[in-house]
Amino acid sequence: MKTKLNIKLYDEKLLWCTLCLLLIGVTMVTSSSIPIAYRIYHDMLFFTKKQILYLVILFFIFKIFLDVPISFWQKNNKIILLISISTLLLVLIIGNSIHGSLRWITISYVSMQPSELSKLAMFCYLSNYLSQKNSEIVNNFGGFLKPIIIISFPLILLLVEPDLGTTIVILLTTLSLLFISGTKIQKFIPTILIIVVTTTVLIIKSPYRFERIMSFWNPWNDPFGKGYQLTQSLMALGRGNIFGMGLGHSIQKLEYLPEAHTDFIFAIIGEELGYIGACTILFMIFFISFRAFKIGKIALKNKIFFSGYFAFSIGLWLIFQTLINVGTTIGLLPTKGLTLPLISYGGSSLIIVSIAIIILIRIDFELRMKNIQAFYKTDI
């Protein structure tokens, strides 16, 4: 008999890293939201209490979803996609308009952002499609176009909201997954050209997007108008320097920087925790992404294709969304309205991203269980 196999059932590093980011998120939401929470609700901890409530909900979600086998997601991928499309249609009918965008559905005191669910739903569907029709996608151009055409309908709904940021994250992740599946680089050229032309037309024809682009090129031309948010963000980052001003000592959060606790929370992180603190948080997010890639690689090696592609899609999603959020904060990209995963205030983003990571942990768990079963089979 061989010695007892010493394999941990869960990826503890992934679990602890996620938990640390969630706690950092609550801390930074508290610090960045106190002024606006007091002005609007006369309660300095209004947003903190809601964020903690989301974490409590996450605790129960974790216990439920961790027991859900990956086969459930594969079998029900089309239903999940249809539910996502239904909510995207619903938001256009009864959604609340915020800053010119229809992104929220509010029922009583509960609000949800359908675009967050759309990411998980589309990557679930795409992972199943790639796992079943990989040879068709790799060997002919029609097979390559099919998944892009299928996801184009929900993407159009996202553009109607408009939510260009989520659309870009989904497109980049989709193209990256197709590349990972073995598709030759030549097939991407016409698709990328179409995307570039379409994006350019959408920007030119939409005053909302065009203004964002113009303010991005040189925010200092109109620092108190169209370039106000970006200039305030850059001032926050510049003030933070290497070590930061200290937790709670941000000046820009005193309602100088709009969306300080949501889309632009990274600027407050840079101001209070400095370059070192900001880079540490980015490292932790990228650590989760690279763990996802490692898990995906192991799954593909074991020919568990759905789990492999799903794991890769989660890792790519986190990387692209983080890069776009940080890029807008530091002035490298136009404002997109995307949250910083696991950090920014907001229930929809926090819960959906956390569910994605729970799925990732479940994929890893099933791979470990397979190794344990294989060990005991050879042991007998």
From Swiss-Prot:
Cellular component aspect of the GO annotation: cell division site; plasma membrane
Enzyme superclass (EC): transferase
Pathway membership, UniProt: Cell wall biogenesis; peptidoglycan biosynthesis
GO terms of molecular function: lipid-linked peptidoglycan transporter activity; peptidoglycan glycosyltransferase activity
Catalytic activity entry: [GlcNAc-(1->4)-Mur2Ac(oyl-L-Ala-gamma-D-Glu-L-Lys-D-Ala-D-Ala)](n)-di-trans,octa-cis-undecaprenyl diphosphate + beta-D-GlcNAc-(1->4)-Mur2Ac(oyl-L-Ala-gamma-D-Glu-L-Lys-D-Ala-D-Ala)-di-trans,octa-cis-undecaprenyl diphosphate = [GlcNAc-(1->4)-Mur2Ac(oyl-L-Ala-gamma-D-Glu-L-Lys-D-Ala-D-Ala)](n+1)-di-trans,octa-cis-undecaprenyl diphosphate + di-trans,octa-cis-undecaprenyl diphosphate + H(+)
Alphabetical keyword list: Cell cycle, Cell division, Cell membrane, Cell shape, Cell wall biogenesis/degradation, Glycosyltransferase, Membrane, Peptidoglycan synthesis, Transferase, Transmembrane, Transmembrane helix
The keyword Iron is assigned to this record: no
Places the protein is found: Cell membrane
Residue intervals passing through the bilayer: 14-34, 52-72, 79-99, 112-131, 141-161, 162-182, 188-208, 268-288, 304-324, 341-361
PANTHER family: CELL CYCLE PROTEIN, PEPTIDOGLYCAN GLYCOSYLTRANSFERASE FTSW-RELATED
Functional note: Peptidoglycan polymerase that is essential for cell division.
Family to which this protein belongs: Belongs to the SEDS family. FtsW subfamily.
Name of the protein described by the UniProt record: Probable peptidoglycan glycosyltransferase FtsW
UniProt lineage: Bacteria, Pseudomonadati, Pseudomonadota, Gammaproteobacteria, Enterobacterales
Gene: ftsW
